[in-house]
A protein has these predicted regions:
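Post-Walker A helix-loop "phosphate-sensing" segment adjacent to the P-loop in P-loop NTPases
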Residues: 135-146, 171
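Non-catalytic terminal/linker segments enriched in charged/polar, low-complexity residues
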Residues: 1-98
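Conserved C-terminal guanine-recognition region of P-loop GTPase G domains, centered on the G4
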Residues: 130, 165-167, 185-189, 206-276
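NTP-binding/hydrolysis catalytic cores, primarily Walker-type P-loop NTPases
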Residues: 268, 272-316
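Pre-Walker A adenine-sensing motif
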Residues: 96-109
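Switch II (G3) loop of P-loop NTPases
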Residues: 118-123, 146-157, 164-182, 189-212, ...
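Short hydrophobic/aromatic beta-strand immediately N-terminal to the Walker A/P-loop
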Residues: 114-116
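Hydrophobic positions on the alpha1 helix immediately C-terminal to the Walker A/P-loop
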Residues: 128, 132, 161
């Protein structure tokens, strides 16, 4: 008599399902145990199904107060039918985070656009400006007449590099030293659709240099978008402190660089969440112009939980 293979297969399937369920429960318990000695999180009780996403978010470098507030919102608003499903919890949490991130789309109207890049030293302002210049002047969808002004008279090497970029791209470039000459430089480039302005890297504590930058803005005679350039590799406390130091310049958008040089991105999320300032671009490498992508909340949230890859950036 031949063995009943159908019955045996069914038993094997049943055992496999039980093992899968058991493994999932063990995973949930493990995620709960990892933080058992932590503070009581303001009496926020994290159910087992939420533990995995909580752990990932906390390890990402996100400020704990932000994480707790978002987790509380998730607990209060997630439908009861979804709370017992870790996959549904994760999906809802992702969606909530995406909706909390303001992103500024590229403006494609006919008005002239003037962008000034400001920020601390070493964040890649000059390279980012070169990427923007190539993007606007030689973009696939539309090409704009693009001009460059540099106010960075302190770093001779950076100025020479920018002049080389401008020469290669056949773009007009002017260097300005005195505040009084700034308005005239903008007028000289009045035929341009886009004017990009490079500035000296400034410490947020150097009030004298920052006030000089403010004078350039006030004597420009033009509407200038101030873009604060920051590195994704900085600690969240430093990012927020730098932002506060530059905030009197009335920052329009953020540009976040060096995505390829870090593994955690919760700090970037917390910066945008706390300041409620739109982010416009992410710089994801050194290549000009390819390694600059328009900011999208989906991309940043994926980086927060799953890390950064060049493939993700190219998919954008």
């Amino acid at each position: 008599k031949e063995p009943n293979t159908n019955g045996m297969n069914k038993k094997i399937d049943d055992v496999a399902k039980q093992v899968s369920v058991l493994s999932e429960k063990i995973g949930l318990i493990t995620d709960m145990i990892w933080d058992e000695k932590a503070p009581n999180r303001n009496n926020l009780s994290i159910p087992p199904e939420f533990a995995s996403i909580y752990k990932l978010a906390k390890q990402s470098g996100m400020k704990e107060e932000h994480l707790e507030a978002i987790m509380q919102t998730t607990l209060e608003n997630l439908p009861v039918s979804m709370k017992s499903n870790p996959t549904a919890v994760k999906r809802y949490f992702y969606s909530l985070l995406r909706n909390m991130l303001p992103c500024r789309k590229e403006i494609s109207d006919k008005k002239q656009r003037i962008m000034m890049l400001v920020g601390p030293t070493g964040v890649g302002k000059t390279t980012t400006l070169a990427k923007l210049a190539a993007r606007f002047a030689y973009g696939n969808e539309k090409r704009y007449k693009t001009g460059i002004i540099t106010l960075d008279t302190y770093r001779i090497g950076a100025v020479e590099q920018l002049f080389q970029y401008a020469k290669m791209m056949k773009l007009p470039i002017l260097d300005v030293i005195e505040v009084e000459d700034f308005q005239n430089a903008i007028k000289q480039l009045s035929y341009c659709d886009v004017i990009l302005i490079d500035t000296t890297g400034n410490s947020q504590y150097d009030k004298e240099k920052l006030e000089r930058l403010d004078k350039f803005l006030k004597h420009s005679g033009a509407k200038i978008d101030v873009n604060l350039v920051l590195s994704a590799g900085s600690k969240v406390e430093d990012l927020i402190e730098i932002y506060n130091g530059f905030s009197f310049l009335e920052i329009d958008t953020l540009i976040i660089t060096k995505f390829d040089e870090t593994k955690i991105f919760g700090n970037v999320f917390s910066l945008i969440y706390e300041t409620n300032t739109p982010v416009s671009y992410f710089s994801v490498g050194q290549e000009v112009p390819d390694d600059l992508v328009e900011a999208k909340s989906e991309f940043l949230v994926e980086c927060v939980f799953d890390g950064f890859t060049k493939q993700k950036a190219s998919d954008e």
